[in-house]
């Protein structure tokens, strides 16, 4: 006799995941309708009078076909594999049962590829990225929290095999960091981290309070992709304020001897970038300009997507100020406020175990 319940449960799991993709994540019905429209356009004899449009339609058809066909195959495959399981049980046939499990592996692989495609479908998801951390209200406690977040993300990046480079660190008044920027290098770095943008709330008994009272503090994270040099982003030099200063934080014995650190402020948006990781002021300025270009690009993308997000009834606030996760250390509870994912293993999360939170937000299409 076979263990059929685990197999039935797996079929149900694959069916549920397929239904989620078919529904609001990929909107299968709308894509199938659009595919019919695109096919009809491409069948018109005069379509190649506009070669660029024809090529764009061909590319769109390829994308739509892959999604529609894969979902069709998954639904048919799950129906077939359910029948195969029934046949195996009725005939008490181990070979057919093993064939059922093998077919499930194939379907799981197809579904996983489609889920991955949905999670990382953005234009810059494959890119390297920058992560800005900024201590919020809460003084020393918030600055210590910013340094804890930096450590958490560095550990996470290391566990994922990404390389990291500290671009800027501004030390806190007593402990921790006022701000930091880290570059995360590796395929899909931005895709993995983009939903981490927002405010992170810490609740704990402060080690900086002699009375041991409970404090609430905030630090913000902002993730933006490294953009190609050929991306056309107009920056008027008159809109920039460039300050040079002596670097603080890590950097060795020579770090404070020259004003090599550079801070660039884009006055119309009040976006600030800074770099201090090189002894050359010129190199630091180049890096800060690259970050500014990337940050302005992401800023514009967020503005363009704001109306779309409202129309899709996404309840998350647009922008950099929305609170995304609460870390209540005294109660041993970390909860994502967008997806409801929660854990009591707070130390593991602070040591970089973020995948369950990140994957849930990506699969939810945030």
From Swiss-Prot:
Keywords: Cytoplasm, Methylation, Protein biosynthesis. Methylated by PrmC. Methylation increases the termination efficiency of RF2. Transmembrane segments: none annotated. GO terms for molecular function: translation release factor activity, codon specific. The keyword ATP-binding does not apply. GO terms for biological process: viral translational frameshifting. It holds the Pfam family PCRF. It is found in: Cytoplasm. The modification N5-methylglutamine is found at residue 253. One of its GO terms (cellular component) is cytoplasm. SMART domains: PCRF. Belongs to the prokaryotic/mitochondrial release factor family. The gene for this protein contains a UGA in-frame termination codon after Leu-25; a naturally occurring frameshift enables complete translation of RF-2. This provides a mechanism for the protein to regulate its own production. Peptide chain release factor 2 directs the termination of translation in response to the peptide chain termination codons UGA and UAA. This is Peptide chain release factor 2.
């Amino acid at each position: 006799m076979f263990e059929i319940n685990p197999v039935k449960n797996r079929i149900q799991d694959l069916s549920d995941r397929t239904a989620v993709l078919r529904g609001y994540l990929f909107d299968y019905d709308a894509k199938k309708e659009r595919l019919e429209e695109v096919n009809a356009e491409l069948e018109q004899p005069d379509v190649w009078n506009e070669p660029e449009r024809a090529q764009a339609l061909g590319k769109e058809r390829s994308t739509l076909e892959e999604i529609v066909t894969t979902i069709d195959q998954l639904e048919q495959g799950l129906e077939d594999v359910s029948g195969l399981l029934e046949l195996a049980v009725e005939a008490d046939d181990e070979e057919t049962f093993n064939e059922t499990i093998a077919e499930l592996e194939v379907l799981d692989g197809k579904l996983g590829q489609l889920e991955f495609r949905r999670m990382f479908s953005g234009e810059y998801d494959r890119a390297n990225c920058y992560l800005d951390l900024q201590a919020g209200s809460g003084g020393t406690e918030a600055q210590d929290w910013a340094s804890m977040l930096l450590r958490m993300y560095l550990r996470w990046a290391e566990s994922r095999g990404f390389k990291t480079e500290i671009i800027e660190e501004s030390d806190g008044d007593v402990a921790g960091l006022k701000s930091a920027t880290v570059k995360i290098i590796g395929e899909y770095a931005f895709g993995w981290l983009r939903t981490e943008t927002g405010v992170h709330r810490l609740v704990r008994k402060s080690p900086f309070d002699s009375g041991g009272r409970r404090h609430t503090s905030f630090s913000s994270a902002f993730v933006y992709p490294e953009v190609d040099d050929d991306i056309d982003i107009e920056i008027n030099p008159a809109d920039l304020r460039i300050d040079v200063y002596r670097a603080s934080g890590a950097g060795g014995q020579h770090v404070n001897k020259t004003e090599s650190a550079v801070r660039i402020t884009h006055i119309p948006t009040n976006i600030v970038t800074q770099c201090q990781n090189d002894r050359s002021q010129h190199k630091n300025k180049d890096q800060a300009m690259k970050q500014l270009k990337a940050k302005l690009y992401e800023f514009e993308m967020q503005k363009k997507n704001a109306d779309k997000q409202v129309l899709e009834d996404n309840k998350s606030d647009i922008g950099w100020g929305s609170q995304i996760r609460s870390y209540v250390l005294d109660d041993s509870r970390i909860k994502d406020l967008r997806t409801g994912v929660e854990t009591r293993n707070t130390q593991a999360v602070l040591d970089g175990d973020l995948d369950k939170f990140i994957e849930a937000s990506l699969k939810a299409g945030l």
